[in-house]
UniProtKB/Swiss-Prot annotation:
Pfam families: HAT_KAT11, PHD, zf-TAZ, ZZ
Chain ranges of zinc fingers (ZZ-type): 1094-1157, 1220-1273
UniProt GO MF annotations: protein-lysine-acetyltransferase activity; zinc ion binding
Keyword Transcription: yes
Subcellular location per the Swiss-Prot or TrEMBL entry: Nucleus
Residues in Sequence repeats: 188-200, 223-235, 251-263, 286-298, 314-326, 349-361, 377-389, 418-430, 432-444, 459-471, 473-485, 500-512
One Gene Ontology CC term in the entry: nucleus
Protein name (record): Histone acetyltransferase HAC2
Tissues of expression: Rosette leaves, stems and flowers.
Binding site residues for Zn(2+) 2: C1225, C1228, C1249, C1252
Basic and acidic residues bias locations: 130-144
Binding positions for Zn(2+) 1 per the UniProt entry: C1099, C1102, C1123, C1126
Domain CBP/p300-type HAT: 780-1213
Amino acid sequence: MAPPRKRTRDLMPKFLNTESFDEFNQRLNNLPAESNVTSDEDAQFLESRKCQSKRWRKEEPLKLNLRSPWNVLCSPESISSAKFIVEKTCLIPVPSFEEAATNARRCLNTSSIPGSSGSASETNSGSDITKQDFKNDSPSDSKKVQGSSTSKSAKPKVIKVYSFVDLVTTTKKGNIQTEESSLNHEKKLGTVVDIVEPMKCDERSKEVQGSSTSKSAKPKVIKVYSFADVVTTTKKGNIQTEESSLNHEKKLGTVVDIIEPMKCDERSKEVQGSSTSKSAKLKVIKVYSFADVVTTTKKGNIQTEESSLNHEKKLGTVVDIVEPMKCDERSKEVQGSSTSKSEKPKVIKVYSFADVVTTTKKGNIQTEESSLNHEKKLGTVVDIVEPMKCDEGTKCEVTTTNKGKIHTEERSLNHEKKLGTVVDIVEPMKCDEGSKCEVTTTNKGNTQTEERSLNHEKKLGIGVDIVEPMKCDEGTKCEVTTTNKGKIQTEERSLNYEKKLGIGVDIVEPMKCDEENKCEVNADTFDVVIVEPMKCNKVTKCEVNVDTTGVNIVEPMKCNEVTKCEVNVDTIGVDIVEPMKCNEESKCEVNADTMSLQKRSKRAVSLVERFTEEEIKLHIMSLKKPSTQSAVEGMCDLKEEEESCQLCDDGTLLFPPQPLYCLLCSRRIDDRSFYYTPGEEELSNAQHQICSPCHSRCKTKFPLCGVFIDKHKMLKRSNFDNADTEEWVQCESCEKWQHQICGLYNKLKDEDKTAEYICPTCLLEECQSINNMALVDYTDSGAKDLPETVLSYFLEQRLFKRLKEERYQTAKATGKSINDVPEPEGLTLRVVFSADRTLTVNKQFASLLHKENFPSEFPYRSKVILLFQKVHGVDICIFALFVQEFGSECSQPNQRSTYIFYLDSVKYFKPERVTFAGEALRTFVYHEVLIGYLEYCKLRGFTTSYIWACPPKIGQDYIMYSHPKTQQTPDTKKLRKWYVSMLQKAAEQRVVMNVTNLYDRFFDSTEEYMTAARLPYFEGSFWSNRAEIMIQDIEREGNNELQKKVKLLSRRKVKTMSYKTTGDVDVDDVKNILLMEKLEKEVFPNKKDLMVVELNYSCTRCSKAVLSGLRWFCEKCKNLHLCESCYDAGQELPGEHIYKRMDKEKHQLSKVQVNGVLFSTTEDNDIIQENDMFESRQAFLAFSQKHNYNFHTLRHAKHSSMMILHHLHTSNKHHCSQNSSSLTCTACKKDVSTTIYFPCLLCPDYRACTGCYTKNRTLRHLHIFPTLPSANRAPSRTVMVLEILNAISHALLCQHKTTKSCSYPKCHEVKALFTHNVQCKIRKKGTRCNTCYKLWQTIRIHVYHCQDLNCPVPQCRDRKEVLIRKV
């Protein structure tokens, strides 16, 4: 058997020899093999010795924890019968022998061995076998030691402690936070503590108690590097209180030796006791800083600071100040006597007595009192080594009283009473506030007076020796009287230095303002302009208190790295050109209840700056959602060393690659697929690509764009390599990086890279400090700031009305309260493009129809309508509509028709609920926008609207670039159903008269002369594109072939499609007939998708609109409508027509009177808006793809919409600057030359903008405005009220006794109103009659505009006198 290890043997008792231990170890720790077990007793014994854990495959001998006393182990026999104890828990590092017992795998039943005294938590005796369980304690936790150690490697009763961190109990209730520090190290440690290395960055209280007996440390000496932050902080609302209690006497009880200066010790640090260490002098403590034993109390805007440094009780020893106390921002006072050998006895070198000032502020009145009872606190001679530069400790006593607009300051320096010693001023007093002159300031109205008096003889008691000239020395400042009356300012200076100083004054240089001085500004007036900033000295502390408005600081107040700047701004209108940059080492306490102090032009680069606190929180939460992160396909792997975005927690992100289409199959190449490009020089620079499936099917050589391409020479590329990377931006406040899209950063506003960007997180903190107000007020950044048009006003008001009705119906259908039904918020509808364009007809198509006078071009107006919804503070574009309007000035067949060109949407509409009819609210809103547009066109006199239900292919975009992945692309059937549902609603609202399709309207008609010239011609329409291709095919055929094909046609087709009735046709007629025949075959399968919507009836034969007069129609034939002229010229018998197809069956005709529409012509006097971005659908899509304005995620949709609005506002500013005029709103004087307004129909020069018209209800009662606003000085439409007003004046003078005999319009109706008013029984009962109320409303309008003093209208003169008295 091998002997035990050496390290184990060294730890054994000396009287136990090696042979005995070997025999003992053999009996206890060696087990027989399983194959050698012969008896049941041996098997049971072997089973009990096996390890319980399955992971421990290797069995090793368990070394016992032998305890003292060892005198019982006197022989091997006693060992064999000994009873041993195994520890289960140990809190301290143990000797090597005990470590072996800790890691043991097996244990053996032995006789009892007496255990040594200790702190074992659990013991087992006899046959109880226990495996030791040790807890792993972190270095930051407390370490306890008990007992004695005889190990040579460790000193007895000494613990090396590196940090006592965070033994603090923190309680937070609401906005109130309390911290309590309780370091009862006596109870926890109980031993000597040796601090080996300085506790750097130990932010909590660290305290040590006990005595040290370790050899590495001196006896009863503790090396302390920092006693920081034993402070109890209580915060209640806006009131914060700090109390510092350093009872080091009770906690330490030993001598404290401060080895190095306590740098950056921001809280109170105090030392007590005596030092017996060899490195420090007897009973001398080296103190480098006694800082901030200050109790601060803040109530509302009132802040009070009290300084109490009772060093006598806390120190009780001599204080030796080795070096000057730099960066000591609070009151620093020293007491006692010095017995150090390097310094004189009972002399303290003082470099600064700063700011023992009590400040009290009540409302706009601020009072400061300085009390330096140095006699009681110091009691020793004060030696001022260097001049006190802006020494706040010797600052004069200032009493400030502010009553109304009168401001008074009084200063008194009783240095004799406070110091009690002679003051030796070595160098001249440069702005020494301790000897600052007494200033009395009086402000009465706009007059300000300042009086200064330097009674230095009385205050200092010594002669004043001025070595150098006084450069703006506030202590010797001249007496200045300033008077400000209106715009005239007068200053008077009087230098009575003989009286004040007692010596001659030699002024060598002008008094320049010393940057080291401290300026105390208390301004209660307006328009105070400080040309240069108040620069803060490194040693001084700047306290700025601005209680006024209109203070314009040209340059910022720069904060020194060492000083603390306390800024208390309770006003607004403070405009600082550059921000106040605070050093990292300094603490800036900012209390701002007003607008941000940053320059607005330098902060207008992020849209988040206009958000409220709630909007910023919602925006940040939306970026943290996992769906936002996973939606990005092109996200790169985030490396370990790569910095992630602070807002979305993602690294480098990629935009979706630009869409590429295969030249052979015209399909879009997937974003992550491969494609091939030709390597030939002829096609290398062009964008020609082939998808992988087409490349695999191609031959070795194949033609492409007129060039033969070698398949093996083509280059393989990845579409994912074409993706762009999202750009980053760094916050100027926290210096963290975010994606420009996450931070809603607008780089177009920071092209010169001089603007300051603040991230949403920092803006949230700033927003919380200014009472939930937007930091920057953008006046031209939202969708509502876009100019309104007549169409947008009509659609928006109609949409809001319909949403209210839907909400009421949903609440009624579901049985809920109307407040429980969510409504969409933040909807804004604007027309962003409206311009006149011309559609050019294909030359071959125009030459084919030249005999029918088919025009070569069609003028129309193109419009783009966008719907925005504010989501998390951002106006997101959720719906887009492109339309073309062909007005009454256009030729047939496009006259008075509109074409729904394209529409598109993204699925970000809120809320996501269903209506009472069971459809999505999002669908309801989009339907109402379309129905509203059709109604607007109907009122303007349009007769027909054409819709082509053609959905985009999967992966293809119509208007908005890159839709969300969760949004499904509808097929043709779903899209057609969507349009049919919308048209059914329009028919129920009597907006649409009839809905048919293109085939039934033009190809299956019962009337004659249905040729290609009757078909409307639109850009990009289904039938127009097909017709152009068919004409090219017809032109390739010869005339003989055309004649043969005409003979194959039926006689009915030839007669229906030809103008001639003789039966002879020429070549052009043949081409026309063949074209209509081919178009009919193409249109018939898709006729349900080609919808024709009739807004107003038009004549089937002449295609003219039937807007007034009689309209003849057939009840059996849906598409037959005749005007009066066509009916009179017809060959049928009066009152009937012949149905041609069914053997000339005769149908009866009916007639109806048509009421005229509001507009006789479709002339559009709305605002003209032009920009290159929305010139066409393809232009906007290409613009979005170029700048990566996509909508596939919410974060991208926010940023893209923000940038689109920026481009719109920029183009509108340029447009308004060119078209602005003197046309303004009469009420608010707003320029309405480039927007819409409401003109009064009675007052020729009175006009109201949309804001005044909407908000001012009285204005609408006193003036007569049209139903729709006007624009571009267009003449307004008359209304019914104007006709009634004219009829009232006529009816009172009318001589006809009967109403039927008078031909004046509305005369008999007005007379009936007056008769009813006299005989009304409802009004006589005291209740309100609606008919009488409407009459008196009309009379009130008449009174407001009537200029006749003898007006015969009833009550006109009485009401006019009342109106004059009010004015």
